[in-house]
Amino acid sequence: MADRYVLIEVNEDGEGRLKDEAVTWIDFRLSIVDFNASEGLNQLMEQISKDVKDELVLVLFNYRVKSSYDSWSGATEYEDFFDVEFFKVIKKNYKKFYQGLVTVELDVGINGFDNIESMPTDSNQNYYRNLIAEWEEFYNEDFIPLSLNKR
């Protein structure tokens, strides 16, 4: 039985990134625990079907650590393993869906923010600038609000 789960966004090129950079599991006290598992993303992506593209995927997996003693250096070394037990596509055509979420978040229709340059430059806008920058970095293209795409 899997002891951890994570949401992975997969772009059209099959590259993945962790949604929210956190993995969640229930510990022995039945408490939810989070930790950053970006180092395990490659292991998880290798175990997911290569056909998964432009989708949001729920991945259930087991996490284990293997320790080994290096007699030469006298140090104990640890290696992390992320073993996928099950994965399920929970949203197809994720790029368009995510583009819509960012568009709604920016409230383009009401505030008229057609692009990042027209946004106010005060520190409160850093959130919105980062939201757009994350989208552009992941998809390697300029963000265009979804409502403007329909014209």
Swiss-Prot record:
Highest taxon in the source lineage: Bacteria
Annotated protein name in UniProt: Uncharacterized protein YozJ
Species this chain originates from: Bacillus subtilis (strain 168)
